[in-house]
Amino acid sequence: MQVRQSIHSDHAKQLDTAGLRREFLIEKIFAADDYTMTYSHIDRIIVGGILPVSKAVSIGNEVGKQLGVSYFLERRELGAINIGGPGLIVVDGQTYEIGNEEALYVGKGAKEVKFSSIDRANPAKFYYNSAPAHTTYPNKKITLAEASPQTLGDDATSNRRTINKYIVPDVLPTCQLSMGLTKLAPGSLWNTMPCHTHERRMEVYFYFDMDEETAVFHMMGQPQETRHLLVHNEQAVISPSWSIHSGVGTKRYTFIWGMVGENQVFGDMDHIAVSELR
């Protein structure tokens, strides 16, 4: 488990490229037949990936000591979105088949969660977020058709995109976790521009569906102290509440967003005009 500490905006604006990447970029999400896990002190979110190829993978009790619990989801909820081939998630004996761009929400208290691929030649890739939970809500599979879609932007501003909200109050109840997958329209390269912050939630962006030579310039920082990170395929960026989070790609890409914090009102954000950015 990697641990990322919280960082003040006054400190962050003084960092060089290496420092920004060390604090905010998660460079490796997937490892074959294993899981990755990054624990952020910001709202206590956990971010990672699970890539079962030749065997099933589960997050065992080895993380219990680090989390101060007996097992991973004793006091947590989890959301996983599959960006690979068809896979299976078994939660305390209940099996869910999760295809590409399908998701599973797992409520607090699940003791055993196993991830596997149906075809090792086309393995599943489960990207997951986990947040502290105060009560147990039912496990639920969410397909792309069941997600709550919202199309924003315009071709003229190169930011037309469809936000597919998988884990939001309109689809299912959770304690605080929200997740979704945003697809850009052909020819659009910008996401979330004009940008925003939200004081009451933090967010993580996970970029994928990119070829080797594609990069996303991810904008971050306070609106009057912007910085950027160069992000490549299957990498994630931690965004504190004080930071904008927006990106532009050299070519097409897709991204998954996950939020935790004080509320789950999707529109609760502080919009920033482009003319106000520095």
Swiss-Prot record:
Pathway recorded for this protein: Glycan metabolism; pectin degradation; 2-dehydro-3-deoxy-D-gluconate from pectin: step 4/5
Classification via InterPro entries: KduI (IPR007045), KduI/IolB_isomerase (IPR021120), KduI_N (IPR027449), RmlC-like_jellyroll (IPR014710), RmlC_Cupin_sf (IPR011051)
Cited Gene3D superfamilies: Jelly Rolls, pectin degrading enzyme 5-keto 4- deoxyuronate isomerase, domain 1
Cofactor: Zn(2+)
Residues that hold Zn(2+) according to the record: H196, H198, E203, H245
UniProt keywords, alphabetically: Isomerase, Metal-binding, Zinc
EC number: 5.3.1.17
Keyword Isomerase included in the entry's annotation: yes
Co-factor remark: Binds 1 zinc ion per subunit.
UniProt-listed GO biological process terms: D-galacturonate catabolic process; D-glucuronate catabolic process; pectin catabolic process
The reaction(s) this protein catalyses: 5-dehydro-4-deoxy-D-glucuronate = 3-deoxy-D-glycero-2,5-hexodiulosonate
Record-stated family: Belongs to the KduI family.
Protein name as annotated: 4-deoxy-L-threo-5-hexosulose-uronate ketol-isomerase
Gene source species: Yersinia pseudotuberculosis serotype O:1b (strain IP 31758)
